[in-house]
UniProtKB/Swiss-Prot annotation:
Gene name for this UniProt entry: tnpI
Similarity comment text for this entry: Belongs to the 'phage' integrase family.
Designated name of the protein: TnP I resolvase
Role, per record: Resolvase catalyzes the resolution (a site-specific recombination) of the cointegrated replicon to yield the final transposition products.
Domain of life from the UniProt record: Bacteria
UniProt domain Core-binding (CB): residue ranges: 1-84
DNA-binding listed as a keyword: yes
Length: 284
């Protein structure tokens, strides 16, 4: 087993989310590719000088933004911890000061409006795929993350009470989200279709495919792209937060539904987005 796969197994043993495992493992594979391409040798441990050179490469050659670089540094820090536990390394060579300081952006991350979402949902509806419509409606009107939606099991939701348990929330936290009539109707329609899937009897998951017992997020991203170049699963989450606040939800109500551990994250949705800020600048 190569070291990246070993690292992936290590993360899973720590009960990291599927998203975190994929993101960190991808970051390490990229570093290994850069290291072996630069020095023509196999990676056995991390060296401080190499880390500094890699960060410089990400900044000046790849021209990545601070957020992307910081994510790769976080991956390397976790990988460093893994190598120490494995006995391949003794020292921690990634420091907290390696992280690039970023000024907090106070603009709302929402880039789409209600009309955009309605048009998108109508396109999915007219395509007559009940599963895809149920997923899109769930994301737009509950604010759950795509990873959370795809981890919902058949015994996690109650169509009578309109409640769903999110067991795989960020940081391993559980919460109950409320399902409105639009979501309930879409799920009920899909459940009839779900019975025709060959994997329906074996799979405990709500969202399945014809071949797999659990729908993959890359498949969902591809489905969304076939309908829109702008609307993504994550944009629907942003839309929910902004839409809920505009419809009268309190900050704490939105935070509970969306699973925000920090209330300041929710507060961002009370602010204008980048385009609105630019338009305001033109008024000066």
């Amino acid at each position: 087993m190569d070291v990246a796969k070993q690292f992936s197994s290590y993360l899973k043993q720590e009960n990291k989310t599927e998203n975190t495992v994929q993101g960190y493992t991808s970051g390490i594979r990229q570093y290994i590719k850069w290291f072996e391409g630069s020095y023509d040798r196999k990676l056995t441990k991390l060296y401080r000088q190499n880390i500094l050179e890699y960060i410089s490469y990400l900044k000046n050659v790849k021209m990545l933004n601070a957020k992307s670089i910081n994510h790769k540094i976080s991956s390397l820090a976790k990988f460093n911890e893994f190598l120490i536990q494995k006995g391949s390394q003794q020292d921690q060579v990634i420091l907290k000061t390696d992280m690039i300081k970023v000024q907090t952006v106070y603009a709302s991350p929402t880039q789409i409006v209600e009309l955009d979402v309605k048009k998108f949902l109508q396109s999915v509806l007219e395509d007559n795929n009940k599963r895809n419509y149920a997923i899109a409606t769930l994301l737009a009107y509950t604010g759950v993350r795509i990873s959370e939606a795809l981890s919902i099991k058949m015994n996690d939701f109650n169509l009578q009470t309109g409640e769903c348990i999110i067991r795989s929330g960020k940081g391993g936290k559980q919460r109950i989200v409320l399902l409105n009539s639009k979501v309930l109707s879409a799920i009920k329609d899909y459940l009839i279709d779900r019975k025709t899937y060959s994997t329906a009897h074996e799979s405990p998951y709500l969202f399945i495919s014809k071949k797999r017992e659990k729908l993959d997020r890359t498949v969902v991203n591809r489905i969304f792209k076939s309908y829109s170049n702008v609307i993504t699963p994550h944009q629907l989450r942003h839309f929910f937060c902004t839409n809920a606040i505009e419809k009268g939800f309190s900050i704490h109500e939105v935070a509970n539904q969306a699973g925000h551990s920090n209330i300041h994250t929710t507060l961002l949705y009370t602010n204008p987005n980048q385009l609105q800020l630019k338009n305001k600048m033109e008024l000066l």
